[in-house]
């Protein structure tokens, strides 16, 4: 079996006193020590003020809408590319429509002030390994997801990957508009200025934010007109850098957006669905576990079959 080098959510196998770490899922999370600078990031107060002003502008706006072209890649290979449009309105309304550039497939996320709905007009994506063939056949269409969305207590960014458009998370979480603060912000090292550039005819201040001692770096082209970004680039330093780019356009502040834009009712015959929890797919007593191979943090190959008749402890953690 060929080892699978993956990244993101980390799984630790502890067997006979030995700890082996590897990573799994969509978001990169493990900092690469080789890419961490020994020198502290020097914060520029003026650049930091521009960074804060950007978030303050989002939080103080009555409404905000924009379009974005989203692309992320690693090792020179595209991981996903999509276009999305988002509408945000106080106190707690939101709508995001995303579609894949290659297939046109995607989904819609709607918040009606209290509840979040996520649905797929042309059928939902397949979530591996949660979907076996029969489960997917029965639930691939006419289904939706829903959960409470309290003001400041929900994250559009964390739902974006479920839309099936080929994206992971928005670089800047749109829920910042509603007062949400993403967990990365408490790990902000500082912000520095990279001068000024024009983006589609707009004068922008270019700033760079370092997060988690440089594990994640945001480069932002912030418009001098409305203090909101027009280009965004995120570099996440793991074993292979993951680079995400966004280009914002049609940025509109404080327009009158009718509440109907944020209303949605499941059509007749549609059923509520959710991604099965991992524990729902546990092997039954007596079933043979499938063998698999992963790369350890040291680059060695670890196979489950090597620990036959031994206790295996899977420990899951996440950072970033």
Please annotate each region the language model reported.
Residues 1-10:
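N-terminal secretory signal peptides that target proteins for export/translocation
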Residues 14-26:
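Bacterial N-terminal signal peptides
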Residues 25, 29-33:
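Boundary at the C-terminal end of the N-terminal hydrophobic targeting segment
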Residues 35, 42-128, 211-218, 231:
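N-terminal mature ectodomain segment of secretory-pathway/periplasmic proteins
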Residues 42-45, 69-71, 97, 102-103, ...:
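Gly/Pro-enriched, hydrophobic low-complexity segments
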Residues 87-170, 236-245:
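An acidic-aromatic
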Residues 275-304:
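N-terminal "domain-start" segment that seeds a small globular fold
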Residues 302-320:
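Short active-site neighborhood of thiol/selenol oxidoreductases, capturing the structured segment around
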